Amino acid sequence: MRPLPVAPGRLFSQLCCGPKPSASPQSKICLTMARPSSNMADFRKCFANAKHIVIISGAGVSAESGVPTFRGTGGYWRKWQAQHLATPLAFAHNPSQVWEFYHYRREVMRNKEPNPGHLAIAQCEARLRDQGRRVVVITQNIDELHRKAGTKNLLEIHGTLFKTRCTSCGNVAENYKSPICPALLGKGAPEPDTQESRIPVHKLPRCEEAGCGGLLRPHVVWFGENLDPAILKEVDRELARCDLCLVVGTSSVVYPAAMFAPQVASRGVPVAEFNMETTPATNRFRFHFPGPCGVTLPEALAPHETERIS
C-alpha cells in the first residue's frame, strides 16, 4: 500500500514533506512510551477535563456493522483487494470494472446501520455540544455511517460512496440512486468466478450538468491521489486545537491519516487508541483499549459524573 501524497499544511508539511520538527522533552516522553495504559478510570479523567476532542476513525469501526474492508486475508472483491481497484490507473484502464466494484459497495451500504460505536460518538458529540465542548470526527471511511448515526462535526477525508465527480467538468454531486445507472442493475457480484460485465463507457454513470455528459467517477480519494487541501486545512486546525484525541478502529498505516494522532501526541496531548489489536503507532499513545469499538466506546464516552446534565 503506497502512502498518499499530502498537500502542505502547517502540521503536515514537516511530517511528510520535509524534516520533522524537534520534539519537546514532554513529547519525547510520549513518543518513546513503551506500554500505553488500559486504565479506563484514568482515561475518563482526561475525558472529563477535555474541551476539544478529536476522534479519528477507520475501517474497524464500520467492520462491526458488517461493512467489507477489502483488506487482509479474505478481503477480496472477486480476485482483487481495494488497492488494486481504487486507483486512477485502474479507472482509466477499466472504468466498467471499477464502477461495478463501487456499485456493489453502494448497494451493500443500503442495508447497513450504525453500530454502538458510531452511536456512542454521535451521542457524545450532541451531549458535549450542550455543555460548550467540541467533538469532531475525522474519518477515513467512505460509508456515511457516522452521518447516519447523527454526527454533525464530520470531516470525511477520503470522500463518500454517495457522491460523484465528473471527469470532464469536475462537478461534485450527491447521488443516492439505486442503481446509479441502468447498466449497473444487477451487476457487481463479488464472487471470484463472476463474469466481468464490460459495460460500454457511454452506458456508465454520466454527468447531468447542462451541456456536459462527461464520465462520472466516485468522489473518493484513490490510492496515489492527494487529499483535498481544503479538508486538510480543517484537519490541521482541529488537531492543533484539540486537548484529547481518540483513534478508533484504524490500523494507522494509511498516510497521511496515520500521522494525525502521533502529531497530536508529540505535543503532549493525551491520545487513546481503541482497536482490536495493537498498531504501529500504539506505543506513541497514552492509552490503548483492545476490543470491539462497539463495546469499548460506549463506556469510554458515557456521561461523566462531573458533567452538567440538563
Swiss-Prot record:
Cofactor: Zn(2+)
Binding site for NAD(+): 58-77, 140-143, 249-251, 275-277, 293
EC number(s) on file: 2.3.1.-
Transit peptide: 1-36
Enzyme class, spelled out: transferase
Active site positions, chain numbering: 158 (proton acceptor)
Catalytic reactions on record: N(6)-malonyl-L-lysyl-[protein] + NAD(+) + H2O = 2''-O-malonyl-ADP-D-ribose + nicotinamide + L-lysyl-[protein]; N(6)-succinyl-L-lysyl-[protein] + NAD(+) + H2O = 2''-O-succinyl-ADP-D-ribose + nicotinamide + L-lysyl-[protein]; N(6)-glutaryl-L-lysyl-[protein] + NAD(+) + H2O = 2''-O-glutaryl-ADP-D-ribose + nicotinamide + L-lysyl-[protein]
The keyword Transit peptide belongs to this UniProt entry's keyword annotation: yes
HAMAP family, alphabetized: Sirtuin_ClassIII
Comment field on protein domains: In contrast to class I sirtuins, class III sirtuins have only weak deacetylase activity. Difference in substrate specificity is probably due to a larger hydrophobic pocket with 2 residues (Tyr-102 and Arg-105) that bind to malonylated and succinylated substrates and define the specificity.
Protein name as it appears in the record: NAD-dependent protein deacylase sirtuin-5, mitochondrial
